[in-house]
């Protein structure tokens, strides 16, 4: 069996955590909780986490499915260089963003999810993984001479391949697919 790429799981967990933080922050702010400012903080932290985590990283083996519109955010994430590429930094950033939101009931679920994502990122960093962008593959242009095949010699409709006569069978005296002669006499008497 192959190695588990932990960063892929951490990315999904952190993105979901960001969305949960935003939702909890909206509930806390709109509900005018006692510490509503922590709800506003959770909205900002959730947006930051979502922007950081939306671009998927390239897998070391196999292919990676790019998210819709990811290429635009990938450029932004690439600008920060080692700050976003290193999973140790991401793990501690997520853990630091999660702590203040943990003091409010509406955002505690997002805090727990983000703390779990932080732990998974720490595991990925210990295993030596790092974020690398998904680069678009250059499209290979088909060579013009290589794709043209011999045109068919029979006009349509053509018989199936197994029904076509082969020149070697015809020369060998193999009977063709014409009518056969019945060795038994047939009477057409109707009673």
From Swiss-Prot:
Residues 31-35, 105 are extracellular. PANTHER family: CYTOCHROME B-245 LIGHT CHAIN (PTHR15168:SF0). The modification Phosphoserine is found at residue 168. There is a cross-link at residue 149 (Glycyl lysine isopeptide (Lys-Gly) (interchain with G-Cter in ubiquitin)). Subunit of NADPH oxidase complexes that is required for the NADPH oxidase activity that generates, in various cell types, superoxide from molecular oxygen utilizing NADPH as an electron donor. Subunit of the phagocyte NADPH oxidase complex that mediates the transfer of electrons from cytosolic NADPH to O2 to produce the superoxide anion (O2(-)). In the activated complex, electrons are first transferred from NADPH to flavin adenine dinucleotide (FAD) and subsequently transferred via two heme molecules to molecular oxygen, producing superoxide through an outer-sphere reaction. The chain crosses the membrane at residues 8-30, 36-53, 87-104, 106-126. It comes from Bos taurus (Bovine). The modification Phosphothreonine is found at residue 147. This is Cytochrome b-245 light chain. Keywords: Cell membrane, Electron transport, Heme, Iron, Isopeptide bond, Membrane, Metal-binding, NADP, Oxidoreductase, Phosphoprotein, Transmembrane, Transmembrane helix, Transport, Ubl conjugation. Residues 2-7, 54-69, 81-86, 127-191 are cytoplasmic. It holds the Pfam family Cytochrom_B558a. It is a multi-pass membrane protein. GO terms for molecular function: electron transfer activity; heme binding; metal ion binding; protein heterodimerization activity; SH3 domain binding; superoxide-generating NAD(P)H oxidase activity. One of its GO terms (biological process) is positive regulation of tumor necrosis factor production. Phosphorylation at Thr-147 enhances NADPH oxidase activity by promoting NCF1/p47-phox binding. Ubiquitinated at Lys-149 likely by RNF145. Component of the phagocyte NADPH oxidase core complex/cytochrome b558 complex, composed of CYBB (heavy chain (beta)) and CYBA (light chain (alpha)). Component of the phagocyte NADPH oxidase complex composed of an obligatory core heterodimer formed by the membrane proteins CYBA and CYBB and the cytosolic regulatory subunits NCF1/p47-phox, NCF2/p67-phox, NCF4/p40-phox and the small GTPase RAC1 or RAC2. Interacts with NCF1 (via SH3 domain). Interacts with SH3PXD2A. Interacts with DUOX1, DUOX2 and TPO. Interacts with NOX4; this interaction mediates superoxide generation. Residues 70-80 dip into the membrane without crossing it. It is found in: Cell membrane. Residues 134-191 are annotated as: Disordered. Coiled coil: none annotated.
